């Protein structure tokens, strides 16, 4: 079975998808982490978003691996562990623009489909149900109010030791929403056959329970 979970930043996709995959003994594919890993390369190489040839050369020698583990997945970028680095504010600020680049989306979509082809998978991102895995048996679109999503992100950053105000995070969430929904290539949108789940005010375990119920109903039909 293939389960696609899409939604805007801060909706809880990664946390919920990771828990679901563990409960179902499925592979977990965090596509957002892959885009963040590529963004690290842009920052470290001072690569311009307009440098098409430079981007192609960079991607040709880029290797991204997702290594599952009991404490969560590790992201290896050219054999280097960047699991923590990809969650920094600098990466968060640039990732939407990097994600909108056609060369980057093509490269990562192909890589994601290779992982998906291996078997039972829970994949989360912004275009899983519409582009990467449109044939998924279960499609979920997670959302929440912008205020709720900003609060979650703010708590996460504070817990990691970053000094940032809620107002800054809220503005960043709104900016990310605009970039994700208006980009020319694979914009964020709900697939026609996806089930909408609003996570505003819900605890993680409540969201997971809702999704397990949806998956169970779908499984009965298949």
Swiss-Prot record:
InterPro entries: Cytidylate_kin, Cytidylate_kinase_dom, P-loop_NTPase. Belongs to the cytidylate kinase family. Type 1 subfamily. It is an enzyme of class 2 (transferase). ATP binds at residues 7-15. GO terms for biological process: nucleobase-containing small molecule interconversion; pyrimidine nucleotide metabolic process. This is Cytidylate kinase. GO terms for molecular function: ATP binding; CMP kinase activity; dCMP kinase activity. It catalyses: CMP + ATP = CDP + ADP; dCMP + ATP = dCDP + ADP. PANTHER family: CYTIDYLATE KINASE, CYTIDYLATE KINASE/PANTOATE-BETA-ALANINE LIGASE. It is found in: Cytoplasm. One of its GO terms (cellular component) is cytosol. Pfam families: Cytidylate_kin. NCBIfam families: cmk. Its main location: cytoplasm. Keywords: ATP-binding, Cytoplasm, Kinase, Nucleotide-binding, Transferase. It comes from Carboxydothermus hydrogenoformans (strain ATCC BAA-161 / DSM 6008 / Z-2901). Its EC number is 2.7.4.25.
């Amino acid at each position: 079975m293939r389960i696609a979970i899409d939604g805007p930043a801060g909706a809880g996709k990664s946390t919920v998808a990771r828990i679901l995959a563990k409960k179902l003994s499925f592979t977990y594919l965090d596509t957002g982490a892959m885009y963040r890993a590529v963004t690290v390369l842009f920052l470290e190489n001072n690569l311009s978003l307009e440098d098409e040839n430079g981007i192609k050369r960079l991607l040709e020698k880029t290797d991204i691996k997702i290594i599952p583990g009991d404490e969560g997945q590790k992201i290896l970028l050219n054999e280097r562990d960047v699991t923590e680095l990809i969650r920094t504010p600098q990466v968060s600020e640039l990732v939407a623009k990097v994600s909108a680049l056609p060369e980057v989306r093509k490269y990562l979509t192909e890589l994601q489909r290779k992982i998906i082809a291996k078997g039972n998978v829970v994949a989360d991102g912004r275009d899983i149900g519409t582009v990467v895995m449109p044939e998924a048996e279960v499609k979920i679109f997670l959302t929440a109010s912008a205020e709720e999503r900003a609060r979650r992100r703010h708590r996460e950053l504070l817990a990691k030791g970053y000094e940032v105000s809620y107002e800054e995070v809220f503005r960043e969430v709104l900016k990310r929403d605009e970039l994700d929904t208006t980009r020319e290539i694979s914009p964020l949108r709900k697939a026609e056959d996806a089930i909408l789940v609003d996570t505003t005010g819900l605890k993680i375990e409540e969201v997971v329970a809702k999704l397990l119920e949806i998956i169970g109903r779908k499984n009965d039909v298949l």
